[in-house]
Amino acid sequence: MSVNPSNNTTTSTETNTETRPILHLRNKKTDKTAKPRVRWTNDVVDNENMDKKKSKICCIFHPQREFGESSSESSDESSDESDHSDDGAGEGASNGASNGGSGNDACCGNHKRKQKKPRKSTPNAYEKQPTYKNK
C-alpha cells in the first residue's frame, strides 16, 4: 500500500491467490436418446477378416435340448420376452424346414421374398414395326 502526499489518496493492490475449480459439463443421457448397442466380446470371430464385428442376422438359433435339460437363460427371461419368441416360432419352424434349416430357430418372418407377377410379354423397340401416317 502506498500513500501519495500531494493527492492524499491511497492505492491498494490485492492479489487473488485462490484458484477456481474447473467445471466440466457433460450431456446427461436420457432413455430416449440412449440407443441400445451391441457389445462384442474378445471371443467374437471375424469371419470376413476385415476387422469388422457386426451381424445382420435377425434370427436367433435355439438348439434342441435333451428332455429334462434346463438352460440358465430360460429362468432369467420375463414373460414378455418368452411370448415374443413364441410368436415367430411357428412361422420360423415352417420357414426353417423349407430353407434347409432344422426348423428350431425363431424367426421374425421378414425373409420371405415377394413373388413377382409375370410380366406381359411385349416386343422391344427393335421388334416393333413403325407406324406410318398416310400422306
Curated annotation (Swiss-Prot):
Keyword Nucleus annotated: yes
UniProt keyword list: Nucleus
Species, as recorded: Debaryomyces hansenii (strain ATCC 36239 / CBS 767 / BCRC 21394 / JCM 1990 / NBRC 0083 / IGC 2968) (Yeast)
Compartments, record wording: Nucleus
UniProt feature, compositional bias: Basic residues: 110-120
One Gene Ontology term, aspect cellular component: nucleus
Name the UniProt record assigns to this protein: Type 1 phosphatases regulator YPI1
Comp. bias regions, Gly residues: 90-103
A Pfam family recorded for this sequence: PPI_Ypi1
Any one GO molecular-function label of the UniProt entry: protein serine/threonine phosphatase inhibitor activity
Major subcellular location class: nucleus
GO BP term, example: mitotic spindle assembly checkpoint signaling
Family statement drawn from the similarity comment of this UniProt entry: Belongs to the YPI1 family.
Chain spans, region Disordered: 1-135
Biased composition (Low complexity): 1-19
Functional description taken from the UniProt entry: Regulator of type 1 phosphatases which maintains protein phosphatase activity under strict control.
